């Protein structure tokens, strides 16, 4: 299933190039239940996307792209790429998305020089490892210059029925992790997976930071955590730990740009 509010040229359509572009203010809103066949994809492309319903695409993928130009290549290693930003680009994921044994890829870019929240995740996103061994991946991606993403709710790339845990990435210039976050890449029988947080700067603090020490502690109970700062533009790529963190299992890896 492919839904887009952006345009495609006749030449791209005839040649099979899924290159969508335009400045349409139209948005995609899903409040219902969408179920793809096993191995299928559900793709939404628009300047603004809101999901409060349910989307399922096991062994396939759910791809959400918000921008003014988005390129889709289901046969390539990068399935969806937001090439150009859109004014007021935003993806609101407050519903349920599941792609067990597959991919959930959410990417948005906002135009302008002011910081803007482009992804607000408050729902449940799952890409768990299947009993047959295929693991899942979850990506929440904003631009590394000005974009912000707010990450709450549940991100689940665990392996409850065997196999290794999956991979989760939350990446943007600014990444804010809310206190209600529940993230797991836990494997009951195999190797636990990893959650990567990739901002420009990152502060762990009891208040006023990007993530509390309590949220870090809780997240480490569900899997490995990597915080890797980029240091683009005016930001320095620093990591500040100003709150207590305790854990007895899994790995916390901090990699600062400077």
Question: How would you name each of these model-derived features?
Answer:
Residues 1-258:
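Extracellular and secretory-pathway beta-repeat/beta-biased strand scaffolds
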């Amino acid at each position: 299933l492919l839904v887009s509010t952006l345009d495609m040229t006749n030449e791209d359509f005839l040649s099979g190039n899924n290159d969508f572009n335009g400045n349409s203010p139209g948005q995609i809103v899903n409040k219902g239940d969408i179920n793809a066949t096993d191995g299928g994809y559900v793709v939404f492309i628009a300047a603004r996307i809101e999901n409060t319903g349910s989307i399922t695409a096991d062994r396939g993928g759910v791809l959400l792209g918000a921008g003014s130009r988005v390129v889709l290549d289901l046969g390539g290693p990068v399935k969806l790429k937001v090439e150009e930003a859109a004014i007021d680009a935003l993806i609101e994921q407050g519903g349920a998305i599941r792609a067990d044994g597959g991919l959930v890829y959410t990417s948005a870019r906002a135009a302008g020089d002011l910081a803007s929240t482009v992804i607000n995740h408050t729902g449940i996103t799952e890409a768990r490892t299947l009993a047959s061994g295929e693991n899942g991946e979850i990506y929440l991606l904003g631009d590394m210059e000005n974009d912000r993403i707010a990450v709450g709710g549940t991100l689940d790339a665990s392996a409850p029925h065997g196999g290794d845990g999956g991979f989760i990435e939350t990446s943007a210039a600014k990444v804010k992790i809310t206190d209600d976050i529940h993230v797991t890449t836990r494997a009951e029988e195999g190797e636990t997976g990893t959650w990567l947080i990739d901002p420009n700067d990152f502060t762990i603090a009891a208040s006023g930071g990007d993530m509390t020490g309590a949220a870090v502690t809780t997240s480490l109970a569900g899997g490995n955590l990597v915080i890797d700062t980029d240091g683009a533009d005016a930001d320095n790529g620093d990591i500040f730990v100003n709150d207590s963190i305790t854990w007895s299992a899994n790995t916390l890896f901090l990699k600062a740009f400077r």
